[in-house]
């Protein structure tokens, strides 16, 4: 297995999936399928490749007990690629969850697009921004109901 090739293919697949999440509401007949594939099938596929890479490379003299041990893991190209797939899979899954929750909450998709971009680039920051938006959105809805 070539870590560089896996890195490029996985990154491309994740990018296409993020684009799918962004445009899915605008392609109505395909929307549920796009969200299923982009939000669940692709992250699971990335997870499978992650597990295979870890199994193929072992712990390579590293571990998770210290920054030094993690650095030794990341010095191995196959494990660095596995780490990248970890980010891709979880961030994409979180992005799909955000899109799903925002739809349930009635948040307009145009408000969601910057949050998806933020989650794509900076994972936890996008999740945090979504929680802030969710609080503001629910407060706004409550105020409308009381008016």
Segments from the language model and where they lie:
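Hydrophobic, aromatic-rich membrane-embedded alpha-helical segments
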Residues: 113-136
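Loop-to-helix transition at the N-terminal end of transmembrane alpha-helices
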Residues: 30-52
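Short aromatic-rich membrane-water interface segments that cap or initiate transmembrane helices
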Residues: 1, 69-83
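Structural signature of hydrophobic alpha-helical transmembrane segments
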Residues: 5-14, 81-85
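Helical transmembrane-bundle signal
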Residues: 14, 18-21, 46-53, 127
């Amino acid at each position: 297995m070539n870590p560089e090739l896996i890195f490029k293919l996985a990154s491309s697949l994740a990018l296409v999936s993020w684009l799918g999440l962004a445009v899915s509401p605008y392609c109505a007949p395909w929307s549920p399928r796009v969200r299923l594939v982009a939000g669940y099938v692709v992250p699971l596929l990335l997870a499978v490749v992650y597990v295979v890479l870890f199994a193929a490379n072992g712990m390579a003299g590293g571990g998770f007990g210290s920054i030094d041990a993690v650095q030794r893991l990341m010095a191995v190209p196959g494990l660095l690629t596995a780490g990248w797939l970890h980010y891709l899979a979880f961030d994409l899954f979180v992005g799909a969850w955000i899109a799903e929750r925002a739809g349930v909450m009635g948040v307009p998709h145009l408000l969601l697009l910057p949050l998806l971009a933020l989650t794509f680039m900076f994972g936890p920051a996008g999740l945090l921004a979504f929680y802030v938006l969710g609080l503001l959105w629910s407060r706004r809805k409550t105020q409308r109901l009381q008016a």
